[in-house]
Amino acid sequence: MKLFVFLALFGAAFAQRNGFCRLPAEPGICRAFMPRYYFDVEKGQCEQFIYGGCKGNENNFETLKECQDACGEPERASDFEKADFETGCKAAPETGLCKASFERWFFNAASGECEEFIYGGCGGNDNNYENKEECEFACKY
């Protein structure tokens, strides 16, 4: 009986904990400009969005790791793609035309290392990676 109660409570807590991961990204009604992460059910991974600072829903995380810990596994190297070296690794980083402030990674061909830069959210070029691991997989190895 105790095992049944434990399993029932554990199952309910697990379902409740992950239920919010199915909610869509909700920027809220305010006009702040806060890069956040949400779990995209269709893509099966955490994605970045802009949060306005109030309202919204529980599918809203300050870091990629928080989102992955709550809703899904981190990406594996096998999920990444190799880049065309000329367009995806040699190009200088481009902020793009929009005014967002996303932390991204680019491959610095001169140093042979992946480095952070600020991406505006649209435009830019292919030398633009969501994390260091993706950049290194695409350009370094």
UniProtKB/Swiss-Prot annotation:
Taxonomy, superkingdom: Eukaryota
Any Gene Ontology CC annotation: extracellular space
Pfam families to which the protein is assigned, alphabetical: Kunitz_BPTI
Expression across tissues: Expressed in the major tissues of the adult female tick, including the midgut (highest expression), salivary glands, ovaries, hemolymph, and fat bodies.
Any GO BP annotation: envenomation resulting in negative regulation of voltage-gated potassium channel activity in another organism
Claim: Repeat is one of the keywords in the record: yes
Domain BPTI/Kunitz inhibitor: start-end pairs: 21-71, 89-139
SUPFAM superfamilies with a match to the protein in the record: BPTI-like (SSF57362)
GO molecular function: serine-type endopeptidase inhibitor activity; toxin activity
Protein name from the UniProt record: Thrombin inhibitor hemalin
